[in-house]
Swiss-Prot record:
Residue intervals on the Cytoplasmic side: 44-496
Native source species: Neosartorya fischeri (strain ATCC 1020 / DSM 3700 / CBS 544.65 / FGSC A1164 / JCM 1740 / NRRL 181 / WB 181)
Biological function: Component of the ERMES/MDM complex, which serves as a molecular tether to connect the endoplasmic reticulum (ER) and mitochondria. Components of this complex are involved in the control of mitochondrial shape and protein biogenesis, and function in nonvesicular lipid trafficking between the ER and mitochondria. The mdm12-mmm1 subcomplex functions in the major beta-barrel assembly pathway that is responsible for biogenesis of all outer membrane beta-barrel proteins, and acts in a late step after the SAM complex.
Gene field: mmm1
GO molecular function: lipid binding
HAMAP family for this protein: Mmm1
Comment field on protein domains: The SMP-LTD domain is a barrel-like domain that can bind various types of glycerophospholipids in its interior and mediate their transfer between two adjacent bilayers.
Classification via Pfam families: MMM1
Designated name of the protein: Maintenance of mitochondrial morphology protein 1
Main location: endoplasmic reticulum
Protein family: Belongs to the MMM1 family.
SMP-LTD domain location: 131-388
Length: 496
């Protein structure tokens, strides 16, 4: 009995084994939970966001885009290991990308057709129910641009070839446009004005156009300009060449001022795939988008070819292998026929016994100016301007003056910034007049008034001009390569 009581009781080993198993099982479950969280919550694919207009989209609209959707789905499911061919790198653009309805829907703009019938053979216009815009910000940008052009013209007033005086003189005396009974035309006064055009009431309309899918969009905006200081004055002589050349000479002095201009400006985009615009056959057709681009490319090719031949380049001549130019988009602008252009024409005819402000001369000049304007920028005629290349390039990169950052100090400055800041240090600000005027004094020809022999005339008031700048006539080094678009049709004073 005593031996049985003294024997120690053996401790079971199952308790320590069960604790180890439970600890390992708990660690394994935690690892599995972390792995599942990382796999399904972090690396899992997010569901596609619902479309904004999915609830309002009909079944027929979804089926109409099935072709493009299948193409896009095939492109998205393409693995990274598959190397696409060179022709399939750029994804296809849907056929409705340039549709006016699609553009208006994506930009949240409404254009509701209110006049279904066409009038006078013109395209049907769909007026917009969107509220018109004031364009105050656009007026500020346009005013800054015009002010910069005026300042640039003033800084280049002494240049023999780049000044506005020499350019206008070369344009007015173009031998191909000027008739033989008009002597050399001399510009005696130029005023670039001091006011700016005001744009307002901008609205977008949809116009039916068979050349584009779904028509095209036009921006209509009202323009108003009232500036009495926007004028030009010239002097010339009418020659009587019968029975012999220069049998009689009649001095003529004219001044034209734009009192007020108001109208509706139409701006639209002309895609590169659109055929050239049609123009009436009774007048010279303005340059279309294709002809403008082709002419510009030909001039660039000729200039580039001459430089390459002068530099001894090993490239082939441009005539054998002409470079291919890609089509270019353009912007077309015009004015509606209900414009208003008020002019003030002053005239002085004769040398000894003078006729001042002849009404018939004023009527003829106003008729010529209106005809010149209507043949170029009044509907159905439009002016086509190519869109510039807006791709960022290092050659056009500039740094704003006054920035002290390290990047700005090390970055190269463009030539435009250097040219704009260069003349400002050499030009005295006190010499700038309130109204930019340029004049040239003619000592051999009498001015408007006998008391103003030593100064150029001011046709707006008829008396001496106090604020205008006068300078001697240029030495005649006019640029032969200058070309100004537009001209006064027929006889009389013509422009290039």
């Amino acid at each position: 009995m005593s031996s049985q009581l003294n024997d120690p009781t053996p401790i079971p080993a199952q308790s320590s084994l069960s604790f180890t198993q439970g600890f390992l099982l708990g660690q394994l479950s935690v690892v599995l939970l972390i792995a599942a969280f990382i796999k399904f919550f972090i690396f899992g694919e997010a569901p596609p966001p619902p479309s904004r207009g999915l609830s309002h989209r009909s079944a027929t609209h979804r089926r109409s885009n099935s072709i493009y959707s299948s193409t896009q789905h095939d492109g998205n499911t393409r693995t990274l290991r598959e190397k696409p061919s060179n022709s399939n790198v750029l994804r296809p653009v849907p056929s409705s990308a340039t549709n006016t309805r699609s553009i208006l829907r994506k930009t949240y703009y409404t254009a509701i057709p209110t006049n279904p019938s066409s009038k006078h053979g013109r395209h049907r216009i769909h007026h917009s129910s969107h509220q018109p815009e004031s364009l105050d910000w656009f007026n500020v940008l346009i005013a800054q641009t015009i002010a910069q052009y005026r300042q640039t013209a003033y800084l280049l007033k002494d240049s023999p070839t780049s000044s506005i005086l020499s350019s206008l003189t070369a344009a007015l005396n173009n031998p191909e446009k000027k008739p033989s009974f008009i002597d050399k035309i001399t510009v005696t006064d130029i005023s670039l004005g001091e006011e700016f055009p005001i744009f307002s009431n901008c609205r977008i309309i949809a116009v039916d156009d068979p050349n584009s899918d779904g028509g095209r969009l036009q921006a209509l905006m009202d323009v108003d300009l009232s500036d009495d200081n926007l004028s030009i004055a010239i002097e010339t002589q009418l020659l009587l060449n019968y029975p012999k050349p220069c049998s009689a000479i009649l001095p003529v002095a004219l001044s034209i001022s734009v009192v007020r201009f108001s109208g509706t400006l139409c701006i639209s985009l002309v895609p590169a795939s659109t055929p050239p615009l049609d123009t009436p056959s009774h007048s010279p057709s303005p340059p279309t988008a294709q002809t403008t681009t082709t002419g510009r490319s030909k001039r660039e090719d000729q200039t580039g070819g001459s430089h390459s031949r002068a530099g001894g380049s090993s490239e082939e001549p441009s005539g054998e292998n002409p470079p291919k130019t890609s089509p270019k988009s353009n912007v077309a602008f015009s004015f509606l026929p209900d414009y208003r252009l008020d002019l003030s024409v002053r005239s002085l005819i004769g040398s000894r016994s003078r006729l001042q402000d002849v009404p018939k001369v004023a009527q003829l000049v106003e008729a010529r100016v209106h005809a010149w304007f209507e043949e170029r920028v009044v509907e159905p005629r439009v002016q086509v301007v190519g869109l510039p290349d807006l791709w960022p390039r290092m050659g056009r990169t500039g740094v704003r003056t006054g920035d002290d950052s390290e990047t700005g100090s090390n970055a190269p400055r463009s030539s435009t910034a250097a040219d704009a800041s260069g003349p400002a240090h050499h030009e005295d600000s006190s010499r700038e007049p309130e109204v930019l005027r340029f004049g040239s004094l003619l000592g051999t020809r009498p001015p408007f008034d006998l008391a103003s022999r030593t100064s150029s005339f001011n046709v707006e008031t008829g008396d001496l001009r106090s604020r205008s700048m006068t300078r001697e006539e240029s030495s005649g080094n006019l640029s032969d390569q200058f070309h100004m678009p537009g001209s006064l049709p027929g006889g009389g004073v013509t422009t290039t």
